[in-house]
Amino acid sequence: MAAIENVISSAIVRSYTEKLLNHLEVDVAMVGAGPSALVAAFYLAKAGKKVAVFERKLAPGGGTWGGGMLFNEVVVQSDATAILDDLGITYKEIETAPGYFTLDSVEMASALIYGAVHAGAKIFNAMSVEDIIFKGEKVGGLVVNWTPVERLGMHVDPLTVVAKAVLDGTGHPSEIMNLAVNKAQIKLDTPTGKILGERPMWVDSGEASTIENTKEYFPGLFACGMSANNCMGGYRMGPIFGGMLMSGKKVAGLIQASLEK
């Protein structure tokens, strides 16, 4: 047998290379591994779709981990508890507010990540998206590079991931939508054709609009969670996550329907 040092390194390089090669062409390429996109990845992978999620940071989970101001608890309303049940996440009803529940944000983040991966989605962490593939009438994939390359400003050409559908799950900045508007001159399905911008906090409105604004904004290009709210000028809602989870489930259904046309 080869030296164990060589066995370890060879196995890692071989396994990762196979994983990446198998996901250079996918059904759905997602950008950002926050709660909404992870829910979408979970349901789409369960439905048999080939899903790759690209996350800039080392740790997926988005803004879930820290709860509210580092108090690692979050709130979810009753409309979203079925999603928690699907993922095996525990929750406790708030005695003074029936229909609202607290849950451990670390458990939720961990369960979302595990659920998506266990269902068959692949998460590529420490990988940034610097551009989209655009062929005039449809968004057709992503242009990716290592996050350290991006942050160090190294002159290294990227690689591409071809996809039938692209999901912007980048949260408040709507990074992929911004690329689409500013670089590809795409006109989004918004009142102005551009990104309207997120408004201040209004919990009730923000929760409702997060779900309402989740949709296909251009052929092949979808947005969920706070990215969708930013596109349509919705309000933010803080550490209540029902809307985010339901947005992820909604966009999974929309993408699945689009793929099966």
PLM region spans:
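Short hydrophobic core segments
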Residues: 29-31, 54, 160-172
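N-terminal glycine-rich dinucleotide-binding loop that anchors FAD/FMN and/or NAD(P) in oxidoreductases
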Residues: 66-90
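Flavin (primarily FAD) binding-site architecture
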Residues: 168-183
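Extreme N-terminal leader/targeting segments of oxidoreductases
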Residues: 1-27, 194, 199-203, 222, ...
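N-terminal Rossmann-like FAD-binding beta1-loop-alpha1 element of flavoenzymes
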Residues: 21-52, 244, 251-252, 256
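Glycine-rich FAD pyrophosphate-binding loop
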Residues: 45-65
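A conserved FAD-binding loop/helix module that cradles the flavin
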Residues: 231-260
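Feature captures the FAD/FMN-dependent oxidoreductase FAD-binding
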Residues: 88-165
